[in-house]
Each structure stands twice: as structure tokens, then as C-alpha cells.
Amino acid sequence: PTESRGLGDVYKRQTLGKVNFDSVVIADFDESLKSVATSLLYSDVSPDKEYFISLNQWFNESLIQEESLQPMYYPSINKKNWENYKELFYKKFKKYPNHLSLLSYDLVGLIYYLSFKYDFLTSDIEKLFKDESSFKGKIGIFDIKNNEINHRLNFYKIEKNQTTEIF
């Protein structure tokens, strides 16, 4: 009798109730991301009511299968380009690439692009990064301005076990 009375009290209690925000940014990956997101579900914070936004997930298949955490939003490289790169890499090396190899691939392309743009004169390396320009790499577009390189990312939504590009 005492056990069932205690359980009833738990059912009567709310956790957080109505929350005063519309989005949650979860800066984590893989199992840790799923753990944090799942714990939010037990505090009345749900992706049905609040936006769940995370960091680049590299099209993590386990998140695509985890319906209770959907919809979830995240920025990422272009999915089609990533898939093509993985295929080409596998054909050449008989193994799948890691993420660093893709960034390195675009870095070599960027150096070639800047060298070609400045007639292979790289003595003034500062000038290469001060001028405003853009470079289209394998994983997307990079903007160069004021000694900074910014990568334009796409934004994706995982919902109903599918990844959809938003922009």
C-alpha cells in the first residue's frame, strides 16, 4: 500500500512544467548528446515543443534512428558532397575517410586556389588572407576576409528518421 501511494505522488508532480524558452542548444556529440537530450525529455523539455539544436553531427545515423529526440537541427557540411567524397576516398584507399582528411583535402585546394589567384607569388602571405574572396571546396564554400576564413555551413533537420536540408 505504501509503495503504490508513493508512486501516485510521483505521477501527480510536474517536473519543470511550462518552460520560458523556445530552443535548447546542446553542444555535444554521439552518446553524450543523446544522454543530454533524453534527460531533457524527463524535465518537460521536448523537441515537439522546443527546438533542439546541436553542433555538427556529420549525419550521425544513430540520431536518425532516435525518434524521441526528433526533430533536431544542426549545421553541417554539404551532405551530398560528403557522400561523394566518402565514395571516392573508399574507391581509392579501400577504407572510409575520417573528418580530418576532408578538411585537409579542402585546405590543399585552398592553398592552390590562393597561389593561382596571386600568380604563385606567396611572398606576401598576409595579403592572401586580407583580400576578400571565396573558395568553393569539396565540403562547401569558404569566405576569406580580414585574415579570417569562414566556412558557410548548411543547416539540417532530422525528423521522422530522415535528414532534410533546410538551407
Where are these regions (language model features)?
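Single conserved hydrophobic/aromatic residue that forms the stacking wall/gate
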Residues: P1-Y11
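Extracellular/periplasmic periplasmic-binding protein-like sensory domains
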Residues: R5, V19-S23, S35-Y105
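Short, well-structured alpha-helical segments in soluble
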Residues: D9-V19
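Structural motif
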Residues: V25-A27
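Short acidic, S/G/P-rich loop/turn micro-motifs used as interaction or catalytic elements
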Residues: D30-K34
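Segments of small-molecule ligand-sensing domains
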Residues: K94-Y105, Y112-E165
